[in-house]
């Protein structure tokens, strides 16, 4: 009752198709399985339903859960003190140290929607890659100020809004749109209807999104009425792809060596 696609059988030439249809730099490896999934589904139908927006609206990301835990531990410590400690630690610690992200988290401003727990690059990395001048110019590009149409009432609401206005629109929906349209497949996203968006941001309390280590609670309460329990309470797997393993295969390594060296 399902179709399996073996990653080891995927040709590296799929990258040529992705480059053509995306037509811009895109760093999400799940673009590959999304493209292949759209290609396979088109053999059976032309319109499908997608679940995009559910994680952003109802608290489904592990990063949101981690941020909530850090917030509960640090919210009563003044940002001026936390920021100073964070700045000192980030200067002396190596970026690849396990605790570096925690040192960064100390300086997160819980009142600023653009203050990120998961920056694309840390300041030290940008300075190393770009030099002082350019690093200062683009320092906040991945933490751009997000002006929400609805003012977040709680910290979780702020996290949801940040993911909704950045990751969803600039990664997830781009990936879905390019992959599906490449195969003339229409993907409809019920969670992105105006009514559900307003409902999630204005009427659903935090306790029905993330609470006591559980995520997306309200959707699971609804889902367990019609879906088997194993689907409701299974650990979130995401849509990852073994790109590191593929690059070890001869055909993939030769493909990228040729593209990069030429």
Locate each region found by the language model.
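A conditional alpha-helix N-cap/helix-loop micro-motif detector
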Residues: 8, 30-31
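Active-site adenylate/phosphate-handling loop in enzymes that bind or generate adenylated species
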Residues: 11, 36-96, 167, 176-196
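Active-site phosphate/pyrophosphate- and oxyanion-stabilizing loops and adjacent acidic/basic residues
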Residues: 16, 35, 39, 198, ...
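Short low-complexity, flexible loop/linker segments enriched in glycine and/or proline
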Residues: 17-21, 42, 64-66, 246-248
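Adenosyl-5′-phosphate
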Residues: 30, 47-49, 97-262
């Amino acid at each position: 009752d399902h179709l399996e696609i073996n990653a080891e059988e995927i040709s590296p030439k799929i990258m040529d198709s992705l480059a053509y249809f995306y037509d811009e730099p895109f760093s999400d490896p799940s673009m590959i399985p999304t493209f292949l999934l759209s290609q396979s589904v088109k053999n059976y139908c032309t319109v499908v339903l997608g679940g995009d927006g559910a994680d952003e609206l109802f608290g489904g990301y592990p990063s949101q859960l981690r941020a909530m835990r850090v917030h509960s531990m640090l919210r009563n410590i003044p940002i001026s003190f936390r920021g100073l400690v964070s700045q000192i630690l980030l200067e002396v610690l190596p970026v690849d140290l396990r605790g570096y992200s925690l040192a960064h988290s100390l300086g997160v401003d819980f009142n600023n929607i653009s203050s990120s727990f998961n920056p694309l690059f840390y300041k030290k990395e940008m300075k190393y890659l770009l030099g002082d001048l350019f690093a200062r110019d683009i320092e906040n590009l991945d933490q751009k100020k997000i002006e929400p149409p609805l003012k977040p009432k709680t910290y979780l609401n702020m996290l949801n809004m940040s993911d909704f206005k950045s990751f969803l629109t600039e990664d997830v929906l781009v990936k879905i749109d390019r992959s599906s349209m490449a195969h003339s497949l229409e993907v409809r996203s019920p969670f992105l209807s105006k009514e559900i968006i307003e409902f999630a941001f204005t009427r659903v309390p935090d306790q029905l999104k993330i609470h006591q280590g559980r995520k997306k609670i309200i959707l699971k309460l609804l889902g367990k009425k019609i879906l088997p329990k194993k689907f409701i309470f299974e650990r979130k797997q995401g849509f990852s792809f073994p790109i590191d393993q593929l690059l070890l295969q001869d055909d993939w390594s030769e493909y990228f060596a040729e593209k990069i060296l030429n």
